[in-house]
Amino acid sequence: EMLNVVVKGIAAGKRGYGIGPAKVVSNPEEAAQVMKKGDILVTDMTNPDYVPFMKLAGAIVTDKGGVTCHAAIVSRELGIPCVVGTEKATQVMTTGKECTVDSKSVVAYEGAMATMTAQLTSSEGAAPSQAAFVGGTFQAVPTTATKIYMNLGVPEKIEDYKDLPFEGIGLMRTEFILASYIGTHPLEYVETGRSQEFVDKLADGISTVARAIQPRPVVVRFSDFKTNEYRELKGGEKYEIVEANPMLGWRGCSRYISKWYEKAFRLECQAIVKCRKEWGLKNVWVMLPVVRTLWETKAVLEIMRQEGLERSKDFKVWFMAETPSIAILADEFSKLADGFSIGSNDMTQGILMIDRDSERLGQMGYFDERDPAVERIIAHL
């Protein structure tokens, strides 16, 4: 069976096939008008506002992005095929036309591939046996000296994973809660006198996961949106600058200690306090992203202390290890943290001076977490 290849790109998401009508959109508002369950989402590049429609998609195709872009990360979490960095999908694919997205061969075909349609149809009834298989192997998993922690972005997905043999959530991303559940820039809540509403919503999203797996820990990473992503939230344009390269800009700890964002960071801290002290979810820990310097780290920890969050026997503070500086000064940073979570995507970006969202460099093979320089710095850490 031969179908015309419409676009080629970079592999991302689940390795497999997605078949359905293409829906070419330029923004989340357009997606809200046209996306239905099983459609193929085609857009320039996704951001957190697209998540509700990504959940509907049978597959995702983007013009831009690399293996660590938003579309790649979310599609892996949702378990759907994804091809990114095609450069021209929005120009050559047409809304309403059937297409087949093959994330194994990293292409999108024009039309529905009959053999793949048959495979997808027959596999629909396999879910119960797969779940039974997972449940059946649970008891056979050996005890290991190494603890197994999971990553999680979409809180409600914990229901699919909670019975798996893992010791905790090592990275819970708050960005999905901010984009899909809250939707408004935190400083807009502050300015309009609704700070408590923001705290309650964020705490509610975090508690969904913490309650489901307690007493296993949930390491909640404080927000790590880039400026361009914050601008997409309601009211965001009032509070965010425009940066040429947001990946290397005002993000992570540098936001928390700034006069422009500190009030919002304090709300995030208050949400953690609410989970732990009001609701008794002592399994909620935290992690700081994009830790660059010792002085900023100490400043962040002081703000946390003022809000009632201090390292203790039952409250751990981890750092994302994703900047060269934290690896080089690991002995000093380790005095301030209870653990590190290696962010190999950003570490690779920093070591090789590569924009991880560059589709061109991704296509050329430059973005490689196995590069000897990256491996050596991680080994040093």
What are these regions (language model features)?
Residues 4-40, 44-172, 185:
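Acidic, glycine-rich flexible loop/linker segments
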Residues 133-381:
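Conserved alpha/beta-domain cores
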